[in-house]
């Protein structure tokens, strides 16, 4: 991944007046994965469950490049809200053909039902879940995502570890507990949980170690990436902004340590495969 300034993200930063809850570091984190999907040629559309006024949708629209469609699911997408969303998307991404590239679905995500998920099996490369915030809402949205996410895709759950939305975290962990071997959490940070298919987490994990810190430093601020356990025991990485004072008991590591971690992970995975 080229670590120069990401022009699409820079453009997004310029549209600050749009109402919404997506923060600058959240946008940078999601942009990293959208750009990675584009850079590696992963096919598939973008699905957002829970749109509100479209602040994060505008970010997603910048990474379609005529090769993906943006599917927005929210019962509030009508009237003035839809007009505002349409205007904002076309303003931020003038090359976008709204009629061709954007699908508006005014149903609750649970109303998409099983048949819809089967019909769209493997269709999406990127799924952003920010719909209902109950444990059951999140659980059901992940059930849908299991069917609709492509092999190399990414799921991002919003409000993970958010103090005001504790049921979201409960829903994610309950789903992972009940469906072992489907998804693994790659990374948590800025109240986002980034999930990949369990059989693809290693390549994403290596990519994150190698390039996420540099990307965020170029496009947001210097960050710390944390790892407290063996990657095979608990591979989830933590993300926070870098501070001048470091905790002496942390699992935080600098970029130069990443090669040793990757080598250890590859060796451990190989050993498991030979058992």
Predicted ranges, named:
Residues 2-24, 31-275:
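S-adenosylmethionine/decaboxylated-SAM
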């Amino acid at each position: 991944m080229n670590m120069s300034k990401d022009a699409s993200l820079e453009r997004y930063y310029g549209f600050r007046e749009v109402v919404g809850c997506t923060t600058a570091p959240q946008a940078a984190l999601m942009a990293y994965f959208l750009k990675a999907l584009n850079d590696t040629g992963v096919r598939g559309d973008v699905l957002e469950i829970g749109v509100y006024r479209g602040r994060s949708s505008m970010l997603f629209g910048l990474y379609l490049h005529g090769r993906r469609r943006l599917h927005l699911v929210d019962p509030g997408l009508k009237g003035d809200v839809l007009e505002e969303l349409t205007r904002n998307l076309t303003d931020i991404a003038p090359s976008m053909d709204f009629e061709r590239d954007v699908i508006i679905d005014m149903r609750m995500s649970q109303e998409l039902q099983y048949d819809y998920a089967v019909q769209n099996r493997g269709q999406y490369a990127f799924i952003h879940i920010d719909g209902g915030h109950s444990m059951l809402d999140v659980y059901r949205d992940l059930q849908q995502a299991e069917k609709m996410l492509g092999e190399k895709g990414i799921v991002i759950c919003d409000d993970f570890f958010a103090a005001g939305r504790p049921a979201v975290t409960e829903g994610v962990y309950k789903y992972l507990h009940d469906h072992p071997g489907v998804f693994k959490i790659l990374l948590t940070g800025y109240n986002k949980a980034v999930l990949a298919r369990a059989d693809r987490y290693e390549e994403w994990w290596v990519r994150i170690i190698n390039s996420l810190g540099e990307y965020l430093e170029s496009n947001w601020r210097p960050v710390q990436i944390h790892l407290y356990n063996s990657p095979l025991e608990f591979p989830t990485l933590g993300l926070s902004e870098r501070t001048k004072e470091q905790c002496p008991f942390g699992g935080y590591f600098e970029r130069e340590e990443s090669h040793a971690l990757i080598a250890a992970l590859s060796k451990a995975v190989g050993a498991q495969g030979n058992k």
